[in-house]
Amino acid sequence: HQSRFAGIVNSDLIGFQLERNENPMHLNFLYEGVGQIPDTRSMLLDWGQDGQFGTNDPGEGNGVLDEGERLDKDQLRYFSQHQIGFHCAVLRKVQGLPIGIGFKVLSYSLDDHFALGIGLDLGFKKRIKKTNIGIVLRNMPASGLIWDSGTVEGTVSSIAIGAHHPFMPIKIPSFVLHSMINLNGAVSNRHLDSQLRIGSLSLDSALGLEGIYKDKLSIRMGRNSVNHATGGLGVKWEGFEVDYAFLTANVSGEMGNHHLISLTLSLDWILSRVSVVQQD
């Protein structure tokens, strides 16, 4: 479960892993909802500077809030936005190199409008000594949403490169430290917060550190791609894990902090608990 922007945006994800010989299949179901979005399009009384309808004075009917005009609060309405997604990923070895293929379907509703989209991701990973490197090509060759109006909202391909390396500058018994870095490159997501911008190309990085004690307690900290600090804690038991992540708000703090809670359960552990209860 994830809560963002002080609870305005909420999302839930449920994931499963199905063992199929040596090629596991990962299934993920996603829901995201945004409620109480204000719609102010019908509030403007666009009657011009004199505030009287039908006089054709300057400003009447121009769609702009001019001096002398006002808003009708009774015309304020609210709508919501919902997304339901499905993602399936499988892993295969091609000439000894692990190759991942991900297929995704997204259903999107915005007020009275509806859209449907599909996409394909490709990825592979490689271990070089103690360093794990992964590369993901998203939306290959391209993907997008088809709206009920016939409009196609396209999404071009992007690339993500990640690396993980364990290290121990100071040896502490039963303690392991992991470092991680992620680079995201795109040609359509260029924005003012991009760390590197060259024409339409953008490149953003994220960094993280994770310390694990006795494979039970995890402490995490880092910086995301928009230079916001992140942190988190994780506790692991046999067949059961709880993780919490925290993301700071923007500089002004107007959008609130983000909170992410993850719960991981082992199916084998659940079945063993059920078996014990039945025996009792």
Model-identified regions with their sequence ranges:
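Subset of outer-membrane beta-barrel
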Residues: 1-280
